[in-house]
């Protein structure tokens, strides 16, 4: 199990997530070495789980609890659908210069393909947004998406999440519940990384 986890080492979350914090990763890795083998790390504000992922890769001996309050797992579980949809959108965007705004006609064609995908199941609107919308803008549903201009910012390769959550104990609850659950347990370290005050939290749950 440890060997498999070392094989998949992500420097950032595999799918777009508002508020990822990657700049402190190297210093965080150094701090993790200070704790004992029996330490339980509880990631209270899991987000897209980069902290949980780094912790488990650096400390495979430890227990790591990832609080997936935003249901990031659902997006990971549907990554093959997302890749297939993006592949179709890439084909539709052929001939359109990179970063150029799409015409109203192409806007309608793209929306129709996305609506068809939604009718058969799941659409990861946050990931689709990163390929279609102006930098920093995100839509949470088809209603929000159809009101915005589209740009050809298409990702040129598939997303991959293989092994990303390996070894983590995943829960989904209010962070206060986790604090209470482990309050009196020995060797517990809370990883507290809430969204920055300036972060757009409209995409959070």
Model-derived features: positions:
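Flexible, charged surface loops at secondary-structure boundaries
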Residues: 33-37, 57, 120-122, 162-165, ...
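A short acidic (Asp/Glu
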Residues: 51-57, 75-79, 182, 199-204
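Short, well-ordered alpha-helical microsegments
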Residues: 25, 48-52, 178-180
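Active-site segment flanking the S-adenosylmethionine/decSAM binding pocket
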Residues: 167-205
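Conserved proline-anchored active-site loop of SAM-dependent methyltransferases
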Residues: 41-54, 66-70, 131-133, 184-200
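Short active-site oxyanion
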Residues: 37-41, 62-63, 164-169
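S-adenosyl-L-methionine
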Residues: 1-40, 50, 131
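Class I S-adenosyl-L-methionine-dependent methyltransferase module
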Residues: 62-165
């Amino acid at each position: 199990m440890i060997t498999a986890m070392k094989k998949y080492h992500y420097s950032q979350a595999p799918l777009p997530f508002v508020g990822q914090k990657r700049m402190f990763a190297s210093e965080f890795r150094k701090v993790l070495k200070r704790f004992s083998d029996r330490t339980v790390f509880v990631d209270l504000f899991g987000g897209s789980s980069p902290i949980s992922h780094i912790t488990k890769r650096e400390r495979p001996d430890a227990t790591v609890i990832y609080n997936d309050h935003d249901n990031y797992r659902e997006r990971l579980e549907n990554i093959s659908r997302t890749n297939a949809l993006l592949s179709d959108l890439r084909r539709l965007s052929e001939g359109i210069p990179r970063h150029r705004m799409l015409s109203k006609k192409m806007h309608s064609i793209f929306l129709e393909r996305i609506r068809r995908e939604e009718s058969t199941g799941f659409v990861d609107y946050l990931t689709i947004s990163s390929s279609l919308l102006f930098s920093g803008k995100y839509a949470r549903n088809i209603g929000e998406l159809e009101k915005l201009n589209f740009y050809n910012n298409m990702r040129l390769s598939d997303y991959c999440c293989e092994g990303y959550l390996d070894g983590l104990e995943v829960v989904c609850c209010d962070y206060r519940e986790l604090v209470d659950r482990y309050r009196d347990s020995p060797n517990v370290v809370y990883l507290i990384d809430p969204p920055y005050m300036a972060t757009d939290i409209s995409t959070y749950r």
